[in-house]
Amino acid sequence: MTEDLRKQIIYLSSLDIIRRMLRDGIASREVLERLNRRNAESMGCKPVAL
């Protein structure tokens, strides 16, 4: 598995968790969107919309 593919898988897994947090009302959409952008940046991925 290449490093890029590994990072994409990790990012998509974190995106799933963020979407669950949004669905369950754990945090505001604004905070979760910021977290999503930062996760994408740190993994070198293009952010996917919530």
Identify what each model region corresponds to.
Residues 1-50:
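Acidic, Ser/Pro/Thr-rich low-complexity regulatory regions
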